[in-house]
């Protein structure tokens, strides 16, 4: 039977033959092949030490990449103060996280559902960076319920504006978004103009803590989970 991939053969010593067979398997952990005599027969006993990659190695790498991304985002006020160099750096860090996405079909996963807090975006419409800081939303949320195919975006202080819309899955990663109703100051409903409030969103990374999405025009959205139980009012 063939030796496992993780097994490195050490040195086979045969007293009867009087010579050694060096091994060159290239793996990291040696195996001692000991020859012992019992009665008139010579038996070969293999004492193997196995070495496997750390079971959580992928998770640790993912955790580190996420930490680097979030750490780089923290001083940028969700992207409002990001320079072109900052934007390039965040995009590069985001792509590293996307490359280790543990959820291959995000739209089929329950991880996508709930209330997410926006921590970074390149969307000028959301950032409103040209406005005085006191007129910008303090916090932005995006909510998704795939079972009802609903999406909601909410702002907090000072205006509490929100918008709800419908989702149409295009594949296991991308949805078409059609905004339906805006609420001004949190309670004044305004119907979205026909044909203008449409877009597409690709979910490029999602786990229990973090979600990364991309839209047309090089739009980037990075969000952290706020409330996985949140339901969008119907």
From Swiss-Prot:
Localization annotation: Plastid, Chloroplast thylakoid
Name listed for the protein in its UniProt record: Probable plastid-lipid-associated protein 5, chloroplastic
GO cellular component, one term: chloroplast
Organism, as annotated: Arabidopsis thaliana (Mouse-ear cress)
Keywords, sorted A to Z: Chloroplast, Plastid, Thylakoid, Transit peptide
InterPro entries per record: PAP, PAP/fibrillin_dom
Disulfide bonding pattern of the chain: none
Transit peptide: 1-45
Predominant location category: plastid
Family classification: Belongs to the PAP/fibrillin family.
């Amino acid at each position: 039977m063939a030796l496992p991939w993780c097994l490195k053969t050490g040195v086979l010593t045969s007293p009867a033959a009087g010579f050694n067979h060096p091994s060159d398997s290239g793996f990291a952990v040696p195996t001692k092949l000991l020859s012992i005599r019992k009665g008139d027969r010579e038996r070969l006993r293999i004492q193997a030490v196995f070495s496997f990659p750390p079971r959580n190695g992928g998770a640790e790498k993912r955790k580190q990449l996420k930490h680097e991304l979030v750490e780089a985002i923290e001083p940028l006020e969700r992207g409002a103060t990001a320079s072109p160099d900052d934007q390039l750096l965040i995009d590069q860090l985001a792509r590293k996280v996307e490359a280790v996405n543990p959820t291959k079909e995000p739209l089929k996963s329950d991880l996508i559902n709930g209330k997410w807090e926006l921590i970074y975006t390149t969307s000028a419409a959301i950032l409103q960076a040209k406005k005085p800081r006191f007129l910008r939303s303090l916090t932005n949320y995006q909510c998704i319920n795939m079972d009802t195919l609903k999406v909601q975006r909410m702002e907090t202080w000072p205006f509490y504006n929100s918008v709800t819309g419908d989702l149409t899955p295009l594949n296991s990663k991308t949805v078409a978004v059609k905004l339906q109703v805006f609420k001004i100051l949190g309670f004044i409903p305004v119907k979205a103009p026909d044909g203008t409030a449409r877009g597409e969103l690709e979910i490029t990374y999602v786990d229990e803590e973090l979600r990364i999405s991309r839209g047309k025009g090089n739009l980037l959205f990075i969000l952290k989970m706020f409330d996985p139980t949140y339901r969008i009012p119907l």
